[in-house]
């Protein structure tokens, strides 16, 4: 039995490599066929109507905003800093597909499928990139939600601004994280503020007199909002604001200086989010919160004194809202965009704030 078993074992071992070779050939054929089908499908392209509803909505909203920028750049975008004039990459957290919009270089890749956008107001050129596109795997796994200032991301030869999005960017009302609102805000930091100093935090607290002056400022900002398009009233209120700002700076110089800079950096970005929202019909503006819209600025100090909000709100949220309202005031008083040109001329070493821009519009240089 021992001798007869050996030849059988040797015979079996000689057949094993051949079996694995046959399995390997079959797998290779399957991979080649699947790859060929995939490449053929990508070459043929895909209709926007075939996309996941969230992905489709993001592309359609982007196209609507881009068309508004083309039609009315003075109101929908910032002077010389329109994000939609650059290649963009949208990364879907839901489907894990990515969408390359208006590439600067010709796209030729088995991982890229042209998307037929159909009724596309901005005439976008769009490619869907596969979930497993190797270049994007590090960004999907370890990258942030969007490009930060100074960060370069190149996809298919195009330097892009990327943004990740998901269902939560479409299912909330009055939200600064609504898709196009969020895109316009964050992309403005990238394209519009690359030469601005971005150390925009507020530390410390206002003095008791400073809180009183803040209350007066809140009253004026509500009055600005209530004035609508009344130019005479807006100019009157702007003059009062400039006078008040001198008092505030004298009372709390360090705090007010930090506040002015933060409301310039974040207020301008919030303003861009507001204009983008208006372009696509999404309801968003200054003092919008998850549970309410158009809250009154004049509620801030009473809420502070009653403990309903604390100084963190004054330091970390109010500059976004007050800055956006100042931008809307400047846009109403100087629709030609001279205030934006004024802010664009600043550098990393020389700050120009929204209060400075208001003084510039009124010929009151600092």
Q: What residue spans do the PLM features occupy?
A:
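Short, intrinsically disordered terminal tails adjacent to the first/last structured region
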Residues: 1-11
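N-terminal Sec-pathway targeting helices
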Residues: 11-30
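Non-catalytic terminal regions of proteins
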Residues: 24, 37-83, 88-96, 123-127, ...
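Auxiliary, metal-adjacent structural segments of Zn-dependent hydrolase domains
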Residues: 61-166, 197, 201-203
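Short pre-active-site segment immediately N-terminal to the catalytic Zn-binding motif
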Residues: 166-183
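Active-site recognition of the HExxH zinc-binding catalytic motif
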Residues: 181-193, 270
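Post-HExxH zinc-binding segment in Zn-dependent metallohydrolases
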Residues: 194-251, 255, 259-285, 289-301
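Active-site-proximal alpha-helical
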Residues: 254-283, 292-362
């Amino acid at each position: 039995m021992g001798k007869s078993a050996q030849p059988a074992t040797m015979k079996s071992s000689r057949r094993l490599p051949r079996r694995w070779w046959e399995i390997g050939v079959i797998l290779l054929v399957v991979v080649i066929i699947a790859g060929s089908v995939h490449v053929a499908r990508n070459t043929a392209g895909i209709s926007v109507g075939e996309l996941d509803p969230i992905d489709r909505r993001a592309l359609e909203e982007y196209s609507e905003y881009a068309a508004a920028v083309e039609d009315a750049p003075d109101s929908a975008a910032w002077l010389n800093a329109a994000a939609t004039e650059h290649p963009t990459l949208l990364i879907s957290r839901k489907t894990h597909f990515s969408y390359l919009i208006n590439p600067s270089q010709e796209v030729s890749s088995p991982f890229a499928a042209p998307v037929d956008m159909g009724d596309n107001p901005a005439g976008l050129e769009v490619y869907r990139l596969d979930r497993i596109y190797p270049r994007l795997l590090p960004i999907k796994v370890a990258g942030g939600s969007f490009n930060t200032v100074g960060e370069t991301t190149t996809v298919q030869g195009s330097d892009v601004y990327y943004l990740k999005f998901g269902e939560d960017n479409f299912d909330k009302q009055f939200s600064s994280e609504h898709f196009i609102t969020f895109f316009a805000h964050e992309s403005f930091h990238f394209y519009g503020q690359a030469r601005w100093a971005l150390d925009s935090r507020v530390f410390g607290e206002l003095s008791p007199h400073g809180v009183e002056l803040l209350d007066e400022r809140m009253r004026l900002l509500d009055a600005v909002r209530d004035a609508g398009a009344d130019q005479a009233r807006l100019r009157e209120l702007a003059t009062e604001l400039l006078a008040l700002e001198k008092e505030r700076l004298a009372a709390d110089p360090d705090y007010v200086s930090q506040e002015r800079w933060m409301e310039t950096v974040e207020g301008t970005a919030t303003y861009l989010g507001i204009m983008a929202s208006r372009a696509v019909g999404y309801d968003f503006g200054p003092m919008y919160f998850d549970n309410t819209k158009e809250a009154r600025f004049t509620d801030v100090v009473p809420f502070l004194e009653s403990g309903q909000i604390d100084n963190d709100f004054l330091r970390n949220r109010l500059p976004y809202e007050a800055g956006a309202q100042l931008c809307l005031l400047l846009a109403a008083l100087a629709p030609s965009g001279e205030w934006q040109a004024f802010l664009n001329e600043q550098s990393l070493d020389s700050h120009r704030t929204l209060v400075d821009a208001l003084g510039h519009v009124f010929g009151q240089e600092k």
